[in-house]
Amino acid sequence: MKELVFYFDPISPFAYLAFERLPQVLAGCSHVAEYRPVLLAGLLQHWGQKGPAEVEPKRTWTLRHVHWLAQQQGTELDTPAVHPFNPLPLLRLALASSADMRPNRRVMQALLRHVWVGGADASDPARLAALTQEIAPVLDPAGPAVKQALREHTESAVQAGVFGVPSMACDGRLFWGLDALPMLHDAMTGGTWFEGPAWAREGQPREGVQRR
C-alpha cells in the first residue's frame, strides 16, 4: 500500500481542486492519504516568493484559470468574498479535528468547501462557528499544542522541499500542483519513466545566470 502525504492550505483554490479530484486520479491504487496542513505564507516567505494574489495581473489570471479548471473537472467553485484571507483558524481547526492531528477526508471536504463553495467570506465569525460545530474538534484549535504542530508541519515541509500547495509526497518523490496529478498517478501505479535516469538527473544542480 502506498503512503501519500497531501500538503495543503485552504487559501489555495488549486489545493481544493486537487483534493476533489484525488479519488478519481488514484482510483484502483491501494494507498493511504495523510492530509497535512501547512501555512502557504510561511513557505513563500522561506523561499522568497510572492503568492499569486500578491501580483494583481497574476491574481486575475489565476482566478479565471481556476474557474475554467473547475468547470472542466465538474467541481463547483466560487471565489470567496474576501481573498486572500487569514487561513490560520482553518488550518488549526483541521489539526484539532482529531487527537493525532490528522484530519480525515470528511473534515477536509468541509473545510475546503467552506472556502470555495458559495462565495461567502471564509473568515466570517458566524460561519467559522458553524464550521467548528460541524467538525467538532477534539483539541483546542487555539491551544499551544495545535499552534506548535502547524509551525512544525510548515517547517518540516520546507525541509522536504515543499514550496507551494498542493504538494503530494510519495515514495520519496514530491509532486507540486493540480497539473501534477497525472504524474503522481503514473508514479503510484508503477510508471516505467520513473525507473529511468531523468528524475535523478534533473534534480542535479546546473549552472545558470543568477539574478542580482
Q: For the regions a protein language model found, what residue spans apply to each?
A:
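C-terminal cap of thioredoxin/glutaredoxin-like
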Residues: V5, L17-H31, A110-R212
